[in-house]
Amino acid sequence: MAVCIIDHDNIRGVIYVEQVHGKDKVLGSVIGLKSGTYSLIIHRYGDISRGCDSIGSPEIFIGNIFVNRYGVAYVYLDTDVNISTIIGKALSISKNDQRLACGVIGISYINEKIIHFLTINENGV
């Protein structure tokens, strides 16, 4: 399982890439964006030393997410991404080719008995 922590200005979230019932899925939630549609994109580098300006060119479009009127996006997307090929790269949340937030994709601890899914209510809790 891979995980990406997003924490940029007021935009925060956790995105996982994992197998669910034998299929690869992108799961998670993000808060702090305005209502609308945004893109999840994997970039060449995991270098966030200059924020999203140093993550390199886009490589893989994962899919679109919808942010509700409370500023919350719940992510549940199918993907054919090979998890081992994205470790160490960056994931961005973008709109109109503008990178709004990003994080580095890392290896996540796998707990076979319990998988916690981050949920956030309209109050950000």
Curated annotation (Swiss-Prot):
GO terms for cellular component: host cell cytoplasm; virion component. Its main location: virion. The keyword Membrane does not apply. GO terms for molecular function: copper ion binding. Keywords: Disulfide bond, Host cytoplasm, Virion. InterPro entries: SOD-like_Cu/Zn_dom_sf, SOD_Cu/Zn_/chaperone. GO terms for biological process: superoxide metabolic process. It is found in: Virion; Host cytoplasm. Gene3D superfamilies: Superoxide dismutase, copper/zinc binding domain (2.60.40.200). SUPFAM superfamilies: Cu,Zn superoxide dismutase-like. Superoxide dismutase-like protein with no enzymatic activity. Belongs to the Cu-Zn superoxide dismutase family. This is Cu-Zn superoxide dismutase-like protein OPG175.
